[in-house]
Amino acid sequence: MADILRRLTNSERCRLLQDKLDDWYKDYHINSCDSNLNVCCELLELNSKVQGQLFKILSVTAQEGGQYAGVETIKSRFLPWLGTCFSTASPGSFSENSFVTLNESMERKLSTSHERELNEVESKLSSTRIELNSVRQELLETQMDLEDTKTKSANTLLATEEEILQLRAELRAAREKLELRSLDSIDEYERQIRLLKDEISILSSESSILKSRLSRSRSPSPIRHSSRSSSPFARSESPTSAKLTSASRQARLISRFNDIFANDRLDAQTLLRRYIQDLDMVQRIIFIATVESFHSAKMAFRQFRLRVCKSLSPSHMGPESLEDAVIDYIVGNLDLYDVQSSVNEVISAMNVNPKISFPPEVDFILISGFIQEVCRVAFTMQTLDPPLDIAFTVDGELFTDSKYRRTYDSEHTAPLVYYHVWPALMENDNVIVKGEAVTKRGALWNSIRSRSRSASPLRSHSDSPGHNLTRSRSPSPRRSGTPRF
């Protein structure tokens, strides 16, 4: 019996019977008499099938209870119902009066709906006639406007000989002005060509100078240390850098920034990998060194500009502003920048950075050459208008495709940055060069755990007083012959 009841429960007949009843209730007044009778017959058929299964369940249930089980229940429930059924009217119970009444009500409803539809059609017809009349009126007005236009065009074509001569004279004058403008533009183009040729020659000479410096730096001769002058005006201006346009200097700096990422960064990474096996920590060290180098170079540029402005302001004369004169002087004397002080500041800041952990035998002086190059480029970028700077970064920030590229070992579906490999170069709010970042799922939680672990780094900062003294006084080597901007 349980199987029969389960099949009845899973069957769609009861639900289909209810759906058909709902649909019949909605469409009863729209359907015809035959359609309503057909729907009623379908419902009776479905009901008979459901009743057949219910009677089968009733029979099985009674058999399970024994020979006389359930007799009283069946008598009390079915005998009154069977008596009521037998006392009902015969199959011809629908009298003619009910059919007549139903027919009259349907006719009244149909006549009402027909009149309503007829009124709607008449209103639409009247509105269409009004629109047609308005269109005809617009057509007449358009024809009148067309006639007026034709008349005016005919009058315009009847120009006199004097007007034609005047137009010809104006045409000759316009041609002469155009020729003068073309000559002026040609002169301007020639002047720009001469400037570009001069710039190319300057760049060529500077390239030869840089090549000679590079060849001397590769020679086995000892490194020469040049002493820095205390005054920013102790050296003469560099004419090659001063004559370059801002766009050319920006292009060179962007190229040098990309070259540092492609070459110097990898050299520093290879050098650190000899002592630190963790590639993630090595990349973090290089990224933090780059960020600190930009910060130190910007601070040094502000101080240098204040000193130059203070020195030039008493004797400044000429059409250009004092700020332009200061920038021109800095561009022409970039070698006066004390890059070694910035390198020392960067190394000091990295020694107390809580995100870095490394063995005690490793010193950041190993990558002082890389820091030196980044400081030079960052300092020179401040002389541009507008200056170039790196983007602000936070571990666990949302990854942005327009600002960073994912590394090859990143999880490309991860939305957060695990750590940054290289910063993005910005001009105001515009991305000039994309940076590089590692994305992993759970980056925010991993960054928090890495901070908590780095609170006790592998390298102990309190080994001995002598060790700290040696590290604080250890000089950073300078690279001679390094190209400067």
UniProtKB/Swiss-Prot annotation:
The keyword Transmembrane helix does not apply. The keyword Nuclease does not apply. It comes from the Eukaryota. Residues 112-210 form a coiled coil. Belongs to the MIEAP family. Residues 214-241, 471-485 have a biased composition (Low complexity). Residues 214-244, 451-485 are annotated as: Disordered. Keywords: Coiled coil, Cytoplasm, Lipid-binding, Membrane, Mitochondrion, Mitochondrion outer membrane. This is Mitochondria-eating protein. GO terms for cellular component: cytoplasm; intracellular membrane-bounded organelle; mitochondrial matrix; mitochondrial outer membrane; mitochondrion. Transmembrane segments: none annotated. One of its GO terms (biological process) is mitophagy by internal vacuole formation. Key regulator of mitochondrial quality that mediates the repairing or degradation of unhealthy mitochondria in response to mitochondrial damage. Mediator of mitochondrial protein catabolic process (also named MALM) by mediating the degradation of damaged proteins inside mitochondria by promoting the accumulation in the mitochondrial matrix of hydrolases that are characteristic of the lysosomal lumen. It is found in: Cytoplasm; Mitochondrion outer membrane; Mitochondrion matrix. InterPro entries: MIEAP, MIEAP_C. One of its GO terms (molecular function) is cardiolipin binding.
